[in-house]
Design a protein with these regions (language model features):
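Intrinsically disordered, low-complexity Ser/Thr/Pro/Gly-rich interaction regions
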Residues: 1-120, 129-163, 168, 175-198
Length: 198
């Protein structure tokens, strides 16, 4: 430390600022309507300094000068990527609804079984500013030749198998203040007669 600091008797410790680094960051919201009714603020940046960022078991998180939470912080090498969540975005509301779900025999000749499902995700921006949002949904995938899975979405998904995770799809939307976006996903799962889907 450049200067000595004082620690009060019986205190757990003291905080001292060692350095300050600033990076240009992409700030967006990540939403998983099937799991949560709230989206979360994410900041993504590159460590453009010539030094690594040290890991911390506890880091305080601030947004516009206000403390929003605490989190662990992993070490980041020079030139490495930083991705950090900064708590929920209360002005983004998420809804998830199953519109149709059916199962049974399909076809008079082929005698195949099928299950269909249609879901709708609704994202509403109650803030007075626009938000860029990554919306994620998990869909089933097949590891057997006899099991056929087809799906469509409106609007079309921007990415499939996100981060090499099979069945994870993503939409990238920009939502103006006060605007609402709906996403629908239809799935059809087919399997031969005589087999049981588990």
């Amino acid at each position: 430390l450049p200067n000595p600091i004082s620690i009060a008797q019986h205190a757990e410790g003291a905080r001292a600022e060692l350095d300050e680094l600033s990076f240009d960051a992409r700030v967006f919201a990540r939403a998983v309507p099937a799991r949560d009714q709230t989206a979360f603020r994410i900041a993504e940046a590159t460590n453009a300094s010539l030094e690594p960022l040290l890991a911390a078991s506890t880091a305080q998180l601030f947004v516009d000068g206000a403390l929003v939470g605490r989190s662990s912080f992993d070490a980041v090498p020079a030139g490495g990527e930083i991705m950090q969540a900064f708590g929920p975005v209360e002005d983004l509301r998420l809804r998830y609804a199953v519109l149709d779900r059916s199962a049974g025999d399909r076809g008079l000749i082929s005698r195949s079984n099928a299950r269909t499902e249609e879901v709708r995700m609704t994202i509403e921006n109650l803030a007075n500013a626009p938000w860029d949002i990554e919306v994620m949904e998990a869909i089933p995938y097949s590891e057997q030749d006899d099991l056929v899975i087809e799906w469509t979405s409106t609007p079309t998904a921007a990415a499939e198998n996100v981060d090499d995770r099979r069945g994870l799809i993503q939409w990238d939307i920009s939502l103006d203040a006060g605007a609402t976006q709906e996403i629908t996903v239809e799935q059809v799962i087919r399997w031969p007669d005589g087999m049981v889907l588990r």
